[in-house]
């Protein structure tokens, strides 16, 4: 398995393309100049395209991915109804979902043969919309509205329209600020990192009565932390055994172990990392974690070690200015 790491640096308007080898070392293979401040990125389900959101002219750009080395070639673009904060796709590669924090909306862009061709639906009134996360069954879109302390739930129709479910939302505690999400591989649990109180909520997708319920909330910060809380990103290993969340004020990544059924998180430790870690990701082997420092302008590669999933630094690399997003593609 070959792996390519993409790093988005909006201040220098670049994507750095790296080869990740089996020992966790990175080799720079390409630097792409992007026509705009590039922020969120996602790889298409078939691994043929990288979709990126740019501003100040709000667009989604599609780059064709070379199957041999992961190099990028521009392919298409499509306008968006707000500044792109987060970008994702459905599991079949039919739609791109874009959450916009500033516009307070989530949009759906239709894909034709992998290329974006236009917005088919927009839902407004989502104050602080920070991500759009498709459920494992490809039917429910979870959309955290950070400023409203709620996660809105939509059914995605066959033509890409979003229909509010019943119930239409789940709520966090007041002042939590739900931000980014991941799902357990067993498809029974979701995990949401809350920006404003730096916590992680565990959501059971279906209890015996068919409801969605928050079954655990854990603080991601050390006990003696008294500064402003400013959590950012969350990721889980492919085997579902280890979960990671980061905070930008403390510049740390918190390590959690996950119970076998996915219902319980246990805090295992803290890893100091790059200054202001806005984004990170886990590779497809589950052996390495790559974190980007928005203020250090560097990325660090860590090996995931032992039963606890603790992080051991393997190397640091210079990238563009203000790196914000990390994506790993296996090909």
UniProtKB/Swiss-Prot annotation:
Write down the InterPro entries for this protein, in alphabetical order: 6-phosphogluconolactonase_YbhE, Cycloisomerase_2, Lactonase_7-beta_prop, N2O_reductase_N, WD40/YVTN_repeat-like_dom_sf
- Identify the Pfam families for this entry: Lactonase
Look up keyword Acetylation and say if it applies: yes
Keyword Hydrolase listed: yes
Q: What EC number(s) is this enzyme filed under?
A: 3.1.1.31
TM ranges: none
List the molecular function annotations (GO) for this entry: 6-phosphogluconolactonase activity
Residues found modified as N6-acetyllysine: 287
| Name of this protein | 6-phosphogluconolactonase
From which source organism is this entry? Shigella boydii serotype 18 (strain CDC 3083-94 / BS512)
- Gene symbol here is pgl
């Amino acid at each position: 398995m070959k792996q390519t790491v993409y790093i988005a640096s909006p201040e220098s308007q670049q994507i750095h393309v790296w080869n990740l080898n089996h020992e966790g070392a990175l080799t720079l293979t390409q630097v792409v100049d992007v026509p705009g401040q590039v922020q969120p990125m996602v790889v298409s389900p078939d691994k043929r395209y990288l979709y990126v959101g740019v501003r100040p002219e709000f667009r989604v750009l599609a780059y064709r991915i070379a199957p041999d080395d992961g190099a990028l070639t521009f392919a298409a673009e499509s306008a968006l109804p707000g500044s792109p904060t987060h970008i994702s796709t459905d599991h079949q590669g039919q739609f791109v979902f874009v959450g916009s924090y500033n516009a307070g909306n989530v949009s759906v862009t239709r894909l034709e043969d992998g290329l974006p061709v236009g917005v088919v639906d927009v839902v407004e009134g989502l104050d602080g919309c920070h991500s759009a996360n498709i459920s494992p069954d490809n039917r429910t879109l979870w959309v955290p509205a950070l400023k409203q302390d709620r996660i809105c739930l939509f059914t995605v129709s066959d033509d890409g329209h979003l229909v509010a479910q019943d119930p239409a939302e789940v709520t966090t505690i007041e002042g939590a600020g739900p931000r980014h999400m991941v799902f357990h591989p067993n498809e029974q649990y979701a995990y949401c990192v809350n920006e404003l109180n730096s916590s992680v909520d565990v959501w059971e997708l279906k209890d015996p009565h068919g409801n969605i319920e928050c079954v655990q909330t854990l603080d991601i910060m050390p006990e003696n932390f008294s500064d402003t809380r400013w959590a950012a990103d969350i990721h889980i290993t492919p085997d579902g055994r280890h979960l990671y969340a980061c905070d930008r004020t403390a510049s740390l990544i918190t390590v959690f172990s996950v119970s076998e059924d996915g219902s319980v998180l246990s805090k295992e430790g803290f890893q100091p990392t790059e200054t202001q870690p806005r984004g990170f990701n886990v590779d497809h082997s589950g052996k390495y974690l790559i974190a980007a420092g928005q203020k250090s302008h560097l990325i660090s590669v860590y090996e995931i070690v032992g039963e606890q999933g603790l992080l051991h630094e393997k190397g640091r690399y210079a990238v563009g200015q203000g790196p914000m997003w990390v994506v790993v593609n296996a090909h």
